[in-house]
Structure formats: structure tokens, C-alpha cells
Regions:
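Short, well-ordered junction/capping motifs at the entry into regular secondary structure
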Residues: 266-269, 340-370, 413, 418
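Active-site microenvironments of metalloenzymes and redox enzymes
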Residues: 134, 194-199, 211-341, 382, ...
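Disulfide-stabilized, aromatic/cysteine-rich ligand-recognition loop
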Residues: 81, 352-355, 359-362, 388-430
Length: 430
């Protein structure tokens, strides 16, 4: 043990930082590279100083910028497809008290409206020598720049597990940060029930009052561009794409000749479709997240008895039994179209860009819980919530093919988890 520590200290002292700026391919929508002039390549001031690369706003919105050094490389993500914008990425490595290395990452997250009620979720992934990418679990991270982030600004992440990955001075390690807008749903009671009639599931138990702990749900459905980033990162590690995704009316992911994928023009912000339950779960595990349960989905639509939760009870829900996220008006009441449902009168023949009906969001501000795409939930089908054996999975929320009343908080449908449909997508929960 002592000898290993001495070797680590000796190796750390000898380590010379080698830097080469590499401009990666643009995010999944393009195959064109970008050449960085030599004068823009960051200089290393000392081995313990941050490495800085000038990143214009235009570049950070459109291109990945990889900084390849002996220990760490950083990806700058774009925010054009419901990833939150992360900029001014800087990194350094320092020894820990035990002599092993720790990696420090600092960055800015610029969305001005990040708050405790509408936080960001930031996750970190790494790859050693271009091998398989891996999620850095939150147990290996410290600082204010990962997991749930409740205010914008300058953030820091300390990765304590660097030494456990057997890095050496000749390795090239890429690090990628991505952020998702989440919505906080406070703990507390809410009205959960199933009523007979229409497409509603009459076999469900009526539960006039239920209680859930605090959870978070993505403000938007997962987009085509987000899912394409995932496909391009996992590469040959797994499946997740099928030929129907090339349909540019209902999806729009195009395979390239180099085993990568691109988003069809103009389709970045549309919800991903033709997704099985397993595909959705794999994407969310890639992020460190999960699918919402049926109960969470219904509470996200209706809101709790108190919108600030049972702990404070200062903001009573004026419509705790509302059938739709916006209230009790039908989706097409009085010629106002509140979600994307069957037909074209709402302005969309197929899916709509996520957030198109944001003024008709849920009491918490979650968009598109009614219509657009029906969404996978975590639950197996059963006659009571949360329980059941392997078989069908539940989808909620209605879709662009649903009649208006089927876009409510009550209606659910059963699907085999292998089903891939143009009317089904998903969103994240935590």
C-alpha cells in the first residue's frame, strides 16, 4: 500500500501536461468539423492551473469542443434541443490527501430561471481512450455542480474516483456534462382516481386520496435531438434505433455511413417516438434517471391538495380533481386548442415541438402531459397501482391521435414493453 502511494506521488510529480485542442464533430445534427486557429489554443500556465479554451457563444451552441490532455477532456454541450446550456468549462487535477488524484471541473450554467421549483439536473459521463462511456455516479462526486441544481451560475464538481479508474499520464479521458430542466413536485396528498366510461381503465381501484414523497419530473418530453446524442455516444454498445425512426413526419433520426446518427432538419425539438419501454429505460439509466410511475404522472397533471406540499400547506390547489393539466375545460373548448390531439385543428398533423402548448402546462409548470405523445410509465399493468407481474406496461397522457377526452389525467392504456409506436414517447423522473 505504501509503495503504491509513493509511486502515485512520484508519477504525479513527473506528470507533464500535454495539451492538444481538438474540435469534434458538431452535435448529432451535422457532420462538419470546425478548425481552431493555433492562436486560440489554450496555453497551460502550470500543471495545477485550469486549462482554458475560448469558446464563443456561437460555438457553444453549435459544436462540441473536446480538450484532449493527459488526464481529462471536456465536452461543451449545446442547449438547442432541451439540453440546458453549459459553458466556460475548465478543468484541473490535484492530488488528494492520500496522494491519489482528484479531478476538478468548473463551469457555468446560464439558464436564468433555474430555481428550487424549476431546477436543473446535471449528470457527468466519461470515456477513457475513446472506449465505452460510463456514468460517474453521484457517490463519486462532490460540489454544487451535479445532480439537482437549484440556481444558475458558476458551479464546481470534484470527482474523487479518478484514481480508481487506473488512469495514467498517457491516457486520454473525455468528460461530458449535460443538463436537463426538471420540475419539483413536493411531497403530499393528491386526488388519484379512475372513473368508468370512454377509454378509461375501469378495472383500476378508485383511490380518492393518495400520498407521494417528493419527486422531480422533466419539464419536457425527451426530444429527438437528445435521444440522437445518446445513440451517438453508446455506439455499438447497444441498440435503440430502428428504421421507422427515419420517418421525418413522425420522428426523424437518420443513420450515417460512419455508424453515427443525425437529426433530420427541423426535427430537433420534436418528441422522440418509436421507442420501446426498454429503450426509454436505457436512455434514462444513461442519464442516471428513471421513468415516472403512474401515480407520479397523475399527480403531475392534477397537482397536490397543496401545491407547495403538505409540509407548508400555504398554497391550496384550486382544482385538485382537475381532469386536465390546465383545469376542467376540454382541450378544444371555445375554439382554444390546449394540447396536440387528433386532427389538425390544433395546428399540428402529427407531433408538435415539445413545449408548444406551454401556457397550458400543469399546476407545477410541466408541459405536454396531455396529448402530443402518450408516455411510458414505470409500472407494470395491474388492477392496483404500483403492483403487477411481468407483462404489459402502462402509458399515460394521450397522444396526437387521441380524441380530446382521452388526453385527461385518468385515461391510461396498456402496451407490451417491446412496442414501438409513432404515438408513444417518454420523459424523465427522479
Amino acid at each position: 500500500m505504501l509503495l503504491s502511494r509513493e509511486r502515485a506521488k512520484f508519477s504525479s510529480a513527473r506528470r507533464k501536461v500535454r495539451i492538444a485542442a481538438v474540435i469534434a464533430k458538431a452535435m448529432s445534427r451535422t457532420n462538419f468539423g470546425l478548425t481552431m486557429p493555433p492562436e486560440e489554443i489554450a496555453a497551460v500556465r502550470s500543471k495545477n492551473e485550469f486549462l482554458e479554451v475560448p469558446i464563443s457563444r456561437k460555438q457553444s451552441m453549435s459544436h462540441r469542443i473536446l480538450l484532449s490532455i493527459s488526464i481529462v477532456a471536456v465536452l461543451c454541450n449545446c442547449a438547442c434541443s432541451k439540453w440546458l446550456e453549459i459553458s466556460n468549462l475548465k478543468i484541473k487535477q490535484e492530488p488528494t490527501e492520500l496522494g491519489g488524484p482528484k479531478t476538478i471541473i468548473v463551469y457555468d450554467i446560464e439558464a436564468p430561471d433555474i430555481s428550487p421549483e424549476s431546477p436543473a439536473y446535471v449528470f457527468v459521463r466519461f470515456s477513457k481512450d475513446k472506449s465505452n462511456w460510463r456514468l460517474i455516479t453521484k457517490e463519486s462526486l462532490r460540489g454544487n455542480g451535479f445532480d439537482i441544481i437549484e440556481k444558475p451560475g458558476h458551479k464546481q464538481v470534484i470527482w474523487w474516483g479518478t484514481g480508481q479508474t487506473s488512469f495514467n499520464e498517457f491516457d486520454k479521458v473525455d468528460i461530458r456534462l449535460r443538463g436537463i430542466r426538471m420540475i419539483r413536485v413536493p411531497a403530499g396528498q393528491f386526488v388519484m382516481k379512475s372513473l368508468p366510461g370512454g377509454g378509461r381503465d375501469e378495472s383500476k381501484e378508485i383511490q380518492p386520496s393518495s400520498k407521494l414523497p417528493l419527486f422531480y419530473m422533466a419539464r419536457y418530453e425527451t426530444t429527438i435531438s437528445m435521444y440522437t446524442d445518446y445513440l451517438n455516444e453508446i455506439g455499438a454498445e447497444g441498440a435503440g434505433w430502428n428504421k421507422r425512426m427515419t420517418n421525418t413526419d413522425r420522428c426523424g433520426i437518420i443513420p450515417n455511413s460512419d455508424n453515427t446518427y443525425s437529426v433530420a432538419p427541423g426535427r430537433d425539438n420534436y418528441p422522440i417516438t418509436y421507442i420501446s419501454w426498454y429503450d426509454a429505460m436505457n436512455f434514462l439509466q444513461w442519464c442516471g434517471l428513471r421513468l415516472p410511475t403512474e401515480a407520479e404522472f397523475e399527480k403531475a397533471i392534477r397537482g397536490g391538495l397543496f401545491l407547495d406540499g403538505d409540509e407548508t400547506k400555504k398554497d391550496p390547489n384550486p382544482m385538485p380533481e382537475r381532469p386536465y393539466p390546465w383545469g376542467d375545460e376540454a382541450p378544444n373548448s371555445n375554439g382554444v386548442f390546449r394540447c396536440n390531439y387528433d386532427g389538425t385543428e390544433d395546428g399540428f398533423e402529427y407531433t408538435a415541438p415539445v413545449g408548444s402548448f406551454d401556457i397550458f402546462s400543469s399546476p407545477y409548470g410541466i408541459c405536454d402531459l396531455a396529448g402530443n405523445v402518450a408516455e411510458w410509465t414505470l409500472d407494470w399493468y395491474s388492477t392496483s397501482y404500483h403492483t403487477g407481474l411481468d407483462g404489459f406496461r402502462m402509458v399515460r397522457g394521450g397522444s396526437w391521435m387521441a380524441v380530446p377526452f382521452a388526453c385527461d389525467a385518468i385515461t391510461g392504456a396498456t402496451q407490451l414493453p417491446i412496442k414501438e409506436s409513432s404515438i408513444m414517447g417518454f420523459r424523465a423522473a427522479k
